[in-house]
Amino acid sequence: MSLASAETAKIVKEYQLGKDDTGSPEVQVAILTAKIIKLTDHMKAHKHDHHSRRGLLRMVSQRRKLLNFLKRNDLQRYLKLIERLGLRS
C-alpha cells in the first residue's frame, strides 16, 4: 500500500526542517507512520494477506531503526517527534 503523492507532499511539508528537506529522519518516520497506519487498516480487513504483513513488519522495523538513530543523535528532536506522531518510546 502506498500513499498518494499529495499525501506524501503534505506530510513532507508538515515535518520538514528546512525548505528543501525531504530526507530528514523526521520526514522519513512521518511517511512510514502514515504507510503503517494505512497498511494496518488493510490488514484488519485481509487477515491472510501474508505478503502485505511482511511489508508491514519491514516498515515497522525501518521506522524503529530511524527512531533509534534520532534518539542516539538528538534526544530533543526524538521526543518532539514521538509526541507529534503519538508513538510510544
UniProtKB/Swiss-Prot annotation:
Cellular component annotations (GO), alphabetically ordered: cytosolic small ribosomal subunit
SMART domains: Ribosomal_S15
Keywords from the named record: Ribonucleoprotein, Ribosomal protein, RNA-binding, rRNA-binding
One Gene Ontology molecular-function label: structural constituent of ribosome
Top-level taxon of the source organism: Bacteria
GO terms, biological process: translation
Protein's UniProt keywords contain Cell membrane: no
Family affiliation: Belongs to the universal ribosomal protein uS15 family.
Functional description taken from the UniProt entry: One of the primary rRNA binding proteins, it binds directly to 16S rRNA where it helps nucleate assembly of the platform of the 30S subunit by binding and bridging several RNA helices of the 16S rRNA.
Subunit structure: Part of the 30S ribosomal subunit. Forms a bridge to the 50S subunit in the 70S ribosome, contacting the 23S rRNA.
Protein name: Small ribosomal subunit protein uS15
Organism expressing this protein natively: Coxiella burnetii (strain RSA 493 / Nine Mile phase I)
